[in-house]
Amino acid sequence: MGQKVSPMGLRVGINREWDAAWYAEKTQVANLLLEDLKIRKYINEVYAKAAISRVIIERVKGPNNKDRVKITLHTAKPGVVIGHEAETKNKVVKELGFITKKNIILNVVEVRRPELDATLVAKSIAEQLEARASFRRVQKVAIQRALKAGAKGAKTLISGRLGGAEIARSEGYNEGQVPLQTLRADVDYAVAEAHTTYGKLGIKVWIYKGEVFDVQPRAFQEEKKPAKKFNKKPVAAKPANKEEKSSKEVK
């Protein structure tokens, strides 16, 4: 039987960047990976209601060759992440510095169209299901909003005890195109969980935004060399030979 792979992992290095942008020696990879997991877990707990879409972690060297961790948060609610007079942000930076024992740089990037972000759409559906909303209506509304915001296609799938049924099942909706086999297609994918009184529901969301032709990942980017300029001089027409002229006159 054919199995579906993650559309995000399949496109890493083609039209999507890595969420962890750092290199390390072989002996340090495991420790740094565990550190990344702790950072992501803490951020997801503190900003559970802040509509966090993506967390990108970079490791750079600061002054005096000190290790620094640069964290970029993509969110639809930057005001909630930063807090009043950056109080929440400073608190998070302090706690993360205590966890990692390193200097933390926290940047916040606003997601201007949350309807086109699969992670935010999946989290929104999960919150509505926990509030006992209709699973059919929630999916249809999410797809309509995505298409209205400019998506070329959207697909949703909810699995579990839908409506409190004793037998679990899956039900989903799709509209437009969602080409999972086209690698240049910009397909955003996310998974979320909804904890209801009847059990746990799984939510999957696919959003197709169009094809990407000119964007290259960082690993394959090359410096563009300036084109060579050639000074082309106009070529003067050669005068006809006397013999050619005389032959034409004879004809």
Curated annotation (Swiss-Prot):
Subunit (UniProt): Part of the 30S ribosomal subunit. Forms a tight complex with proteins S10 and S14.
Residues annotated as domain KH type-2: 39-112
A Pfam family recorded for this sequence: Ribosomal_S3_C
CDD domains referenced in this protein's UniProt entry, alphabetically: KH-II_30S_S3 (cd02412)
Function: Binds the lower part of the 30S subunit head. Binds mRNA in the 70S ribosome, positioning it for translation.
Classification via PROSITE patterns: KH_TYPE_2, RIBOSOMAL_S3
Alphabetized UniProt keyword annotations: Ribonucleoprotein, Ribosomal protein, RNA-binding, rRNA-binding
Biased composition (Basic and acidic residues): 240-251
Family: Belongs to the universal ribosomal protein uS3 family.
Annotated protein name in UniProt: Small ribosomal subunit protein uS3
Single GO cellular component term: cytosolic small ribosomal subunit
SMART domains for this protein: KH
Annotated stretches, region: Disordered: 222-251
GO biological process, one term: translation
Gene name for this UniProt entry: rpsC
Record InterPro entries: KH_dom, KH_dom-like_a/b, KH_dom_type_2, KH_sf_prok-type, Ribosomal_S3_C_sf, Ribosomal_uS3_bac-typ, Ribosomal_uS3_C, Ribosomal_uS3_CS
A GO term for molecular function: structural constituent of ribosome
